Amino acid sequence: MEKVSFEQFKEGYLDAIGQDSDEVIRSIYDALKLPKTCDKRIGWIRFYAPRAITLKPGETAKIPTGIRAKMEENWVLQCYPRSGLGFKFRLQLNNTVGIIDSDYYNSDNEGHIFAKITNDTKEGKTVEIPAGTGFMQGIFMEYGITVDDDVEEVRNGGFGSTTK
């Protein structure tokens, strides 16, 4: 796991969050924490919020993590909301499970991982995630393909790139 370049983070940040000064964006970028496990006995890595996030019931946020993941072929990174946030607030990833393929690392956006989350509470609760705290967890999984899978195409991109 590593950071994307500052230029890529800034582009993703402005698209997801909106206008902020270069100084603010630089300070957020410099403070990014690389995902890591919180215990050597577990397989999950924790992604940290680059800035404070507050979501009222029904609100959604697109989060530029500033992170990219390099992995071997036949591996995938699966991303989920942190269990406690899902349990307490029904915080959900909008695509249910985030799937990051190994080829995404070399995409035009440097493989910048984004998360789109929604506070789907049925109890009127507001979710507050302070900057630098975990909001999403991921696990690397190996996968197989069928013996007769003869795809030769090479794609570039994330969402929707497999249907082109």
Regions inferred by a protein language model and the residue ranges of each:
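DUTPase catalytic domain/fold
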Residues: 1-164
